[in-house]
Amino acid sequence: MMRAAYFASKLNFKIESTCRASMITQVERIKIVSWERIRDEYIKILKTDKPSIGLVILQKTGLMKYVFPEIDVMYDMEQSPEWHHKDVFAHTLQVVDNAAKLTDKMEIRFAALVHDIAKPNTRRIHPKKGYTFHGHDAVGEKMLDKVGKRMRLSKNLTKYLKKLTLLHLRPIALVKSEVTDSAVRRLMVSAGNELKDLMVLCRADITTKNPRLVKRYLKNFDIVEQKMQVVLDK
């Protein structure tokens, strides 16, 4: 069943209705498949040019509930419209597809998939701000230990995903002119060898359809990278 989702994503085709119906009725049979196999099929989907095709199939057929429940609960989870124009699941799909356009590196694409994994657990309603997700970066980092063990991810991959999830909100905070060199340096030290990958993830996280806003956000990340270079040159 996951292989069908992979081929649909790889070859950009729709699954025939009878086959899709069978996937839905037989969905619980995924329980007999090893987590190593599930992991491998998931990674194959992430390596395609447009992973969202396969990920949507997993969700629509009910497979996602079994193979990645933390992603499944993002579906239809509303975000405040003044901040996000999509629900959490749709936003995540777009980030993954954006990452696929920016890099062939599977690890970054995987990070794009899980970077907001804790939003369902941290969603609160503020009387003026609407929905908030305070701390979803730190909570998400902790959740990935359980995900890594269940999906039989390598320790290195789990560590990598945890780091990018924890840090994905940090770069944009460095745009302000009053930010000190020491603040920039702290992020660089925290990110370490994954700094470039973190910046790719941040750029992929721009999902607005407004070209003016896209240009502004990309420019902000250019400013952050310029500040990093200044610190390196000192």
Task: Write out the residue ranges for each language-model feature.
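Glycine- and charge-enriched loop/helix tracts that form the active or gating conduit
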Residues: 1-113, 117-135, 139-156, 171
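Short flexible/disordered coil segments
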Residues: 78-90, 130-134, 174-179, 217-234
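Hydrophobic alpha-helical segments
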Residues: 120, 150, 168-171, 194, ...
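Short C-terminal domain-edge/linker segments immediately following a structured domain
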Residues: 88-89, 141-145, 194-197, 230-233
